[in-house]
Amino acid sequence: MGDLDEIAPGSQPGLDWREGGVPVSTRFDDPYFSLAGGLAETRHVFLAGNDLPARLRPGFHIAELGFGTGLNCLALARVAQVPMRMTSFEAFPMAPEQMARAHAAFPELAALAADLRAGLSDGTAIRVDSDDFIHFDNPTELPVL
């Protein structure tokens, strides 16, 4: 059986926590963001690397594999000048408490992060800084759209 057979609905990641509040996947031995500056990494790789601030237009839709802590989403929401659409797939979603611990490393994103976590608790649609954000935790629980 492959790795996908090990993914149970509602599976949460196994996490270790490194200095500075960096979550590290015990399954993949991989930090969720840079140990030396997660937000700087996100701004360089995700935002600048994809030229997203300049490319973001009404109707532009971003798809991502691995939502993780939601740092890419939060960083983009912080700079977005138009409503953003983002779809992300996560096999091992973090619990809101785990996200809160990870988000503590980014005080400048605190308000957006709190809105994100509040909406994730019911696993449906949430509003983040006046934009719609839809999060589905588990494909077996998806509503009919």
Give the residues covered by each predicted segment.
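Conserved SAM/SAH-binding loop
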Residues: 69
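S-adenosyl-L-methionine
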Residues: 100-145
